[in-house]
């Protein structure tokens, strides 16, 4: 069953604001508590305000109508890769781009050959990636040539493709005020509501002014039953996508990379609220 008017009023009473937009938040974060994620709480209480004010990471707090912080999350821009190149492959790619650049300045290169080389350069500049067949045609190489093998490897048809995205860096509930949410009678978890009510609209607004193909996160979940990963998959509709990788900070090496496409976010958000009370369906 879809969300009721009473439930809409409850969600409408919640406020989501940038952490540094209200000086009172500097004090209000002191009562934030989460026993399972003390390091995330420490970040909120000691680093987040300055990072938010300096636009390193955008921190948001969700409050009830009494001004108590119920939840916080943070967002920052990121980049996904079809394949993260390093070592010799990265050096080979750099040498290839230099070769193409020099070739583009060759006065003897004319017509369709020149157009093909310039097209490769433009795709490299805009990080749209290279297609093996296009490179082979432009440079008059066979698909199994040693030059292409260095760049594309054994089985890759594309290389160097990047995808614009936004990372959910922090996503944490304040257990000190959990009773507030429990007393609303809403069966959906607070984090699930925060995601669809507040985070998704921000991503949709962002998509109006910049390219953004993916929303992603690193789930710090090393448990055997993968409860956290399952929560992100079942409630927030992320997927465990091994075909993409990201520029991974050191502290995320022990985490699971999850992502979802943004192209259907609006439709899925609508569906979430249309089926807000699934247990009441006949």
What are these regions (language model features)?
Residues 1-187, 194, 201-282:
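Non-catalytic substrate-recognition and accessory regions of acyl/acetyltransferase enzymes
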């Amino acid at each position: 069953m879809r969300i009721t008017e009473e439930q809409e009023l409850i969600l409408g009473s919640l406020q989501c604001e940038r952490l540094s937009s209200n000086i009172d938040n500097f004090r209000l974060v002191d009562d934030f508590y989460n026993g399972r994620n003390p390091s995330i709480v420490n970040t909120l209480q000691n680093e987040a305000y300055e990072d938010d004010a300096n636009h390193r990471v955008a921190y948001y707090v969700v409050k009830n109508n009494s001004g108590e912080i119920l939840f916080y999350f943070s967002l920052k821009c990121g980049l996904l890769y079809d394949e993260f190149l390093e070592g010799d492959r990265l050096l080979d790619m750099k040498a290839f781009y230099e070769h193409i650049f020099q070739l583009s300045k060759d006065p003897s290169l004319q017509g369709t050959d020149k157009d093909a080389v310039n097209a490769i350069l433009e795709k490299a500049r805009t990080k749209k990636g290279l297609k093996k067949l296009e490179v082979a045609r432009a440079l008059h190489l066979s698909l199994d040539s040693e030059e292409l093998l260095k760049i594309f490897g054994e089985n890759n048809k594309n290389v160097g493709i990047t995808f614009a995205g936004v990372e959910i860096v922090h996503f944490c509930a304040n257990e000190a005020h959990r009773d507030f949410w429990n007393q609303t009678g809403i069966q959906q978890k607070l984090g699930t509501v925060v995601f669809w009510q507040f985070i998704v609209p921000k991503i949709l607004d962002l998509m109006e002014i910049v390219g953004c193909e993916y929303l992603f996160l690193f789930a710090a979940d090393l448990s055997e039953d993968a409860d956290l990963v399952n929560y992100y998959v079942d409630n927030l509709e992320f997927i465990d996508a091994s075909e993409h990788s990201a520029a991974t900070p050191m502290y995320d090496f022990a985490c699971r990379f999850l992502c979802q496409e943004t192209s259907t976010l609006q439709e899925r958000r609508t569906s979430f609220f249309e089926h807000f009370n699934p247990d009441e369906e006949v």
